[in-house]
UniProtKB/Swiss-Prot annotation:
The gene is RS2. Transcription factor required for normal cell differentiation. May interact with other proteins to repress the knox homeobox genes. GO terms for cellular component: condensed chromosome; nucleolus. It comes from Oryza sativa subsp. japonica. Pfam families: Myb_DNA-binding. This is Protein rough sheath 2 homolog. Gene3D superfamilies: Homeodomain-like. Residues 1-58, 59-113 form the HTH myb-type domain. CDD domains: SANT (cd00167).
Amino acid sequence: MQPPPMRERQRWRPEEDAILLAYVRQYGPREWSLVSQRMNRPLHRDAKSCLERWKNYLRPGIKKGSLTDDEQRLVIRLQAKHGNKWKKIAAEVPGRTAKRLGKWWEVFKEKQQRELRDRDRRRLPPPLDGDERGCAGGRYDWLLEDFADKLVNDHHRRMMAAPILPPWMSSSPSSSSSPSVTLSLASAAVAPAPAAPPPTWGGGGGGEVVVAELMECCREMEEGQRAWAAHRKEAAWRMKRVEMQLETERACRRREATEEFEAKMRALREEQAAAVERVEAEYREKMAGLRRDAEAKEQKMAEQWAAKHARLAKFLDQVAACRRWPPVEINGGGGGGPGGGR
């Protein structure tokens, strides 16, 4: 008999589930390749699909629907303990399969990451407009311009505070005065000292180096902020996991304490019932012993009374036998009397 062609991967229909359930009720959960042959109804599914359908959806005892809060906390705690070993985790979560728990964990992790991304997006400052960002076009160009302005102003203030003096004014006070000094003061043909060239920011080579260093610092700051944001997001996610694990452990400990208390109460009740049963058994045994003793005493007294009655009857019989006259003597006495002599 040729096996039926396999159906393409699609959802199971209710009639296919009914065929599979009827087969399991009749033949048990084994030999899945013989479902169509034994049930005389075409089931276009291979043995592996039938096994997975039975094990993950149709097997008795499997819970359907969303996980409860206690189950979610338990799965989070077990995942932190065992990792992604879902078969091992499913063994400790009754009514849930490894496939179901793995799918729930993927959805839960994606949801947590999406919430963290949304939260970080709300916390980041809004980007600046094009006219506010300057010529560089970066996020921190306004900071670069501020740094450049501060450097230019500081340099200008230092230059104004320390002006360049001519050589004849910067001479030491210990030098002796000479007529050349008076002549140099009165002479108008003395050439003035050359003025210091103003600093060129942005046009000279030194300004370009400073701007490049500032740009590099800004890039490093931006990379540092990205790394810090990623670390912060990871830390927030781990913190939330730790909080959920702590809550799960707290609930588990509370449940374990409740179960332990109930177990102790059951043990006390059982011990009390056993003690009552022992007392009742001892009472019944003592009552039975007293009843047996009473019956034995009564029987003994009855036997004694019967023996006394027998001895008394025997004694009476003996007394009666001793007082009875023999009939020969009575007749002889009558013949020897006066009437007999006649």
